[in-house]
Design a protein with these regions (language model features):
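Alpha-helical solenoid repeat scaffolds
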Residues: 1-208
Length: 208
C-alpha cells in the first residue's frame, strides 16, 4: 500500500519500477492494474541475468509469448545485444531465429549469413532485421549493398518503427554519396526519412 501511495500521482519511469508497483497492486487485490504494470515494465526493465530468471519465474502467469517478443524487440532496437542474447531461449522458435540473426548482426559475431538464411520467410522484410543488416553493411564500407536495402524498404514511420535510428544510417550513407559527387542519390535517401518530430527531423530537413 505504501508503494502504491508513493506513485498515486504518476507512474514510475523505469520498467523495473513499474514491475514493483504492479506487484504491490496485485498484493492489494487489484489484479488487472497490477498485471498491466508488470507487462509494461517487463518490456523495458533493466534486468541482470539472475533478475531475469527470478522475475520470469515470479510473474509467469502474468506474462505471455507476446510480452517476451515485445521485450526482445525493445532490446534489439536499443542495441542491448547481451540482454537480447539472454532472452532468445524464451522466445517462440520462429522469433528465436529472427532475433538470433539480429543479435549476431549487432554484436558483429560470427555466423551472420547462416543466421539470416534461417530467418523464416515471413520475417525476411522485418524492419529491425533490415535496419541491422543496413548498419552491418554500412560499417563494412559496403555502400552499394547498403543502398540496395534503402531502395527496397518502405519509407514510412509505421514500417521503420524507429525512423530516428534509420536516419543516422541514412545521413552517414548520404555523406559518403556526396563525397563521391552522387548528389541526386544522396538527396533521394535523405528526403525519404519518415521523421515527423525530434532533433533528427531538423537535421534531415536541412540535409534534404
Amino acid at each position: 500500500k505504501k508503494i502504491i501511495n508513493m506513485f498515486e500521482k504518476s507512474e514510475p519511469l523505469s520498467g523495473y519500477g513499474k514491475i514493483i508497483l504492479g506487484e504491490s497492486f496485485i498484493k492489494s487485490g487489484n489484479i488487472n492494474e497490477g498485471t498491466k504494470l508488470i507487462k509494461d515494465g517487463w518490456v523495458t526493465a533493466d534486468l541482470s541475468r539472475s533478475e531475469l530468471k527470478s522475475f520470469r519465474k515470479k510473474y509467469k502467469k502474468h506474462l505471455d509469448s507476446k510480452d517476451y517478443i515485445k521485450r526482445a524487440d525493445y532490446l534489439a532496437w536499443e542495441n542491448k545485444y547481451w540482454d537480447l542474447k539472454r532472452m532468445l531461449r524464451y522466445l517462440p522458435k520462429e522469433y528465436q531465429l529472427l532475433y538470433t540473426a539480429r543479435q549476431l548482426l549487432m554484436s558483429k559475431s560470427y555466423g551472420v549469413d547462416s543466421a539470416i538464411s534461417r530467418v523464416p520467410k515471413k520475417f525476411i522484410n522485418d524492419p529491425g532485421l533490415n535496419y541491422d543488416r543496413l548498419k552491418w553493411r554500412r560499417k563494412r564500407g559496403r555502400l552499394e549493398s547498403s543502398l540496395e536495402i534503402l531502395d527496397n524498404v518502405r519509407n514510412t514511420k509505421n514500417y521503420m518503427v524507429r525512423p530516428d535510428k534509420w536516419w543516422i544510417e541514412r545521413s552517414i550513407i548520404a555523406r559518403s554519396l556526396i563525397y563521391k559527387k552522387k548528389y541526386q542519390k544522396a538527396y533521394k535517401i535523405t528526403s525519404m526519412h519518415g521523421l515527423s518530430e525530434g532533433p533528427e527531423l531538423a537535421d534531415a530537413e536541412w540535409m534534404s
